[in-house]
Amino acid sequence: MTIVVFATEYDAANVIFSILCRSPSEHLIFPIIVKYKPSNNVSFCLQTQKCKNSKRIDTVFVCHAEKLNLSHYIQTASPIKAEDVANSLNDKETELLYVDMILSQTGKEKEDVEFKYMAYFHKSLIIKYLTGKFLLPTSPFWFLSTYGQTEGLLLLTMYYYLFEEQKSTITTTKNYVQCFTENTGSMVFTYSSMSEFINITLKSKFRKLFADFATYARQKNLRDKEEFKYLDTQINLFRKSSHLTNTFRVHYIYIAYNTALETTKFVNYCNITSYDSNLPIGQQCQRNVHILGNSLHENLLCIMKQYFNADCYFKTYIDIKRLKNPDLNVTEYEYALASKKKTIQALTSEQITRAIAKCNKNGEGLFSPVKPGLQGLLEISASDKYVQIQDKRIYRRQHLHKDYHRPFPVFRVQLLHKNIFCFGNSEDWYENMGFNRILQYLPDEYISDEALTRAIWLQDTHFLCDDFEKQFYTTRHEIFNERIPVTNYIGDLDLPLQDTATITEETFFSMCRLIRLTLINAWKKIFPSIDTHTHPIFFFKTQCDTTNDALDYTEDPTEIKQFCICRKKIGLRISIPLPNGTAIAGGEPLKQLSKILNHVMCLDQELSQILNSLTFPGECFDIGIYHTGHCIRIGYMYKTDMDKGKMLHGRLTPIFIVPEGYRNSCKTFIQMQMDLNNLLHHGTKKAPIEELIYSITDKGCPKENLSFMDLKSRQLWNKVNIATDTLITKYLNTHGFNNNATSADDSLLSFIRLIGWPIIKTQLITHYETRIAQQFSQVTFLKIDSKNLQIKKTQFGRVSDFSCLNRQHRGNRDNVLVYIQLKADGNRLILILWSTCFATKCQSNSKQVHCSIALEQLKN
């Protein structure tokens, strides 16, 4: 059956209704595009609002072909009178289109009545059906804005999209047209009437290409499906074989598709699959199969496989700079933990300022002054400057206390009404924490990590007070000092929890053991001398906050017993001692080390499965704590909550994950975890420091605030472009214009007048009607900013704006603003001509782009 897609210049639903009732008005039916097939009938169709199985048109009435004589109208490109359509209407076929709808809506049985009467008495149903199901455009503008503004683009896109029932969008079909032919014909002006419009669509030379284009487009569609199926397979193969976190998995998918479909690669793919006139129509789109998927492997997957494989990651991406020398002369804290002689001083901020001022005064002429305050105290602690007096060295720090021969720790302690800062080099840590009594009652044999952790009962307290002696052992924080070498890696690890997470004891300890295994393997690659069977990693967990649940708590024996009832996050503190004789200098290597540990935690399959089931893993190690003056809570200490009655809560309690080498002497391991010097950044060690690590770099993402995925995303989205003013200068020089401009404004205006505007003006004269082109015969330019200029037309010495470039409005006043925008695209400029019109039909002052011209690519 021959199919005609048509339009009207009046409300199509009412025009169709009048035809169905055989009482036609004087309106016209405009055949837009026709698909011929020998038949006694002609189907008149409209585009549907929804398409099932890619069927995008449906019939609204059927005519007898012989009575209608459609070929006459097509050959003469003439509209069909509604009366002629009504007279040739095939009532039987047309009735079948509406009868079921009418009967289902009315609930009546079919009556023996002529269709025209049935239609007449159900006008509202038919009008509602037509307006609800079909698109009813009444001007050429809709077709041009939807399918394309050039003759070939319009017709080929419309024919394939409406008639071929293929799973291709309009945008995709337009792309197929551009791949099929470089010449898409002349511009079809939006101001044309419907009669002028069908004169173009029914007489176009592009109608001869319908069959060939449909064949090509189907082959292109199949090739695209095959290409993208292979690309999906390549992306999924790596995704399934790697152990990415959920967040990284999403990032990876976006990066992979954007890498494979990057502009130059996609343009190259389009060129390869473009229509080749040297090949038969049935053998198109068969060159370089799987080019996109293969390019992804070269440009991303091979890099990802190295970065997300632990062995390759450390060999390829991790760069560690070490300084080995037995005479390094750098020292960590000197801090005694079982001393009956207590040298701890407690000062407020004001008292520290006065103490530093006194030190500066006493050392005047001997030592350079330091800033008063906490930073000055940290500098004095780390300073090894001394003066020689009678064969005796007097260090600057001894002005604070005569026994301070080596660096000392500085702590922040929270009291009831204030913070104080404490420093010194000795205390009785074990006695004051009650560890001596705890160790007496520990079992001698190792049973399990869980049993050992349950066996520890720490002395507890709940309230803040102003007694420094008590609070020193409940709310102490170590202040980081990057001038002192780091002997323990202290990691602040927060794992945000999913809403549905249920954390049993078995799950939690399995997670901790896997974290230990992952981190110790990474430690072995950084420090090859360690023994992974004995080297300790100390875990602490922030106690769950049970205050919200205490009143409502009732034990249900059927419920799974949870080890952790935290709802927002699991807070862990992890301490990994560096090998004896080794230290890290400064905070920057620690930030990079935290990023590395973040990454390796995502590489273990078992650990990733647990983390993905409970948490939102990713950048979990906090790198903000490695700045001089920043502090971190020490293991066994409490949080303070001033809003809840000055309560202590969230204590860092020990979680014992005993290495295999200490299973026969678990008490020794517990004593190590109770040793404060294993829990401080700069803790005291037995061996002198002979190796100093001063740089650790992940070459895949050297910036501390960016992950590897973030860096790849930024490289994709923030494509590096040459500055606009630099490109302007290059274009002026390339075209032989001496740029003697004294400012960027002069360069921009010179570029537009000499290079940009002649190109735009030629485009306007070629593709726009005379009414529009003539407005640009005499113009001047006003600079808005470094990338935008406004155009004004000049007449008889007067400057004014333009009349609308899209439509001829009633009145048609000169109130339309026209601009040129410059956009950098790699090594070239794109010129965009756009305007704003206040009329409602022009979207009320919204941006209307008229042309976009890419200038030639500049040579590097």
UniProtKB/Swiss-Prot annotation:
Keyword hit for Zinc-finger: yes
Listed GO MF terms: DNA-directed RNA polymerase activity; zinc ion binding
A Pfam family per the record: Herpes_UL52
UniProt GO BP: bidirectional double-stranded viral DNA replication; DNA replication
Name of the top EC class for this enzyme: transferase
Keyword Transferase applies: yes
Family the UniProt entry places it in: Belongs to the herpesviridae DNA primase family.
Function: Essential component of the helicase/primase complex. Unwinds the DNA at the replication forks and generates single-stranded DNA for both leading and lagging strand synthesis. The primase initiates primer synthesis and thereby produces large amount of short RNA primers on the lagging strand that the polymerase elongates using dNTPs.
Subunit text: Associates with the helicase and the primase-associated factor to form the helicase-primase factor.
Protein's name in the database: DNA primase
Species in which this protein is naturally found: Human herpesvirus 6B (strain Z29)
